[in-house]
Each structure stands twice: as structure tokens, then as C-alpha cells.
């Protein structure tokens, strides 16, 4: 599912991708988004070591983490946006990491232990999409009641039949 591109594809490789290749860290460059932010695809099993490498490289701020359903019955994706914040940076360096996983066993190692701000964001992705973040200290529903069945933002989710009691005014 993931191939490492060679150095002759520098058109879609940014500085971080070249640095990761130099240090033998597996990834797949996906190019740049409309704002010029480098996007990389990472395998779930490579994520813990790569997360630490990103932190060592200087990405000290997790700007956001989200998830989405690629297609009904297909893959789920967990997306991380990191920023390298320094004292004298007018234009901080940013990176986007995408991890695609099968919906049958959607497990990704948690990065809570590197960036504490991942706490509620990973919990929301768990609550809405059912992605299990391994080694998360408190992975439980955050928006839906604990009794809720299923993962409401998956494209194959079937809304349960229930009727709300309404006040008669």
C-alpha cells in the first residue's frame, strides 16, 4: 500500500521528505496542497518512530488532527497537521501526515505521548469514525453517549430508527 519514491521525483518531495529518505524513514510523498504544505503518507506501524523523528526535526506544535472516510466500505484516514514554530520564523514550516487504514481493524498508535494536544482530537476521531488509537490514556467517547452504537461519520453508517419525545406546547 505504500511505496518509497526515489530521489528523481523531487517535484513532489519537500525538504522533510528528503530528510526522511536520508534517515531511512519509510513514507510516501503525496505532493503539496494548495497552500504549498508538504503532504506525506505514512504506514500505521511506522507512525510511532516517525512521530518522534518529526518532533526531533522541530515540529513542536500539533495544529490539528482529524479523520475522514475515504469511501463507503473502503479505507479510513487519520490526518495530522504539524507546525514548526521558532522564535524568528515569519513563515513557519508546516507538514501534513496522512495514515490510511482498513476499516475492519482501524488501529493507529496514539501520539499523545509526544504531543499532549492529540488527546481530545484522537478521542473525537475515535468517537465519530471508530479509529482506535493504541496506547491512548483515555480513549472513550467524547461527543456521543457511551451507549451509542456505531460510528456516525462513516459513510456506511445507518442511522438508527428512534423517535424523540417532544414537549407538547
UniProtKB/Swiss-Prot annotation:
One of its GO terms (biological process) is photosynthesis, light reaction. Keywords: Chloroplast, Membrane, NAD, NADP, Plastid, Plastoquinone, Quinone, Thylakoid, Translocase, Transport. It is a peripheral membrane protein. InterPro entries: NADH_DH_suC, NADH_quin_OxRdtase_su_C/D-like, NADH_UbQ_OxRdtase_30kDa_su, NADH_UbQ_OxRdtase_CS. One of its GO terms (molecular function) is quinone binding. It is found in: Plastid, Chloroplast thylakoid membrane. This is NAD(P)H-quinone oxidoreductase subunit J, chloroplastic. It comes from Marchantia polymorpha (Common liverwort). The gene is ndhJ.
Amino acid at each position: 500500500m505504500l511505496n518509497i519514491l526515489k530521489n528523481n521525483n523531487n517535484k513532489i518531495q519537500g525538504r522533510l521528505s528528503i530528510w526522511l529518505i536520508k534517515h531511512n524513514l519509510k513514507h510516501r510523498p503525496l505532493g503539496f496542497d494548495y497552500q504549498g504544505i508538504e503532504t506525506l503518507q505514512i504506514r500505521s506501524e511506522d507512525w510511532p518512530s516517525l512521530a518522534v523523528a518529526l518532533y526531533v526535526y522541530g515540529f513542536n506544535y500539533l495544529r490539528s488532527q482529524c479523520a475522514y472516510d475515504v469511501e463507503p466500505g473502503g479505507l479510513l484516514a487519520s490526518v495530522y497537521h504539524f507546525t514548526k514554530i521558532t522564535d524568528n520564523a515569519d513563515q513557519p514550516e508546516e507538514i501534513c501526515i496522512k495514515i490510511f487504514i482498513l476499516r475492519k481493524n482501524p488501529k493507529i498508535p496514539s501520539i499523545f505521548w509526544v504531543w499532549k494536544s492529540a488527546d481530545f482530537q484522537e478521542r473525537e476521531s475515535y468517537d465519530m469514525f471508530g479509529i482506535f488509537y493504541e496506547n491512548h490514556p483515555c480513549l472513550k467517547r467524547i461527543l456521543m453517549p457511551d451507549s451509542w452504537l456505531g460510528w456516525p461519520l462513516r459513510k456506511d453508517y445507518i442511522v438508527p430508527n428512534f423517535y424523540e419525545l417532544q414537549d407538547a406546547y
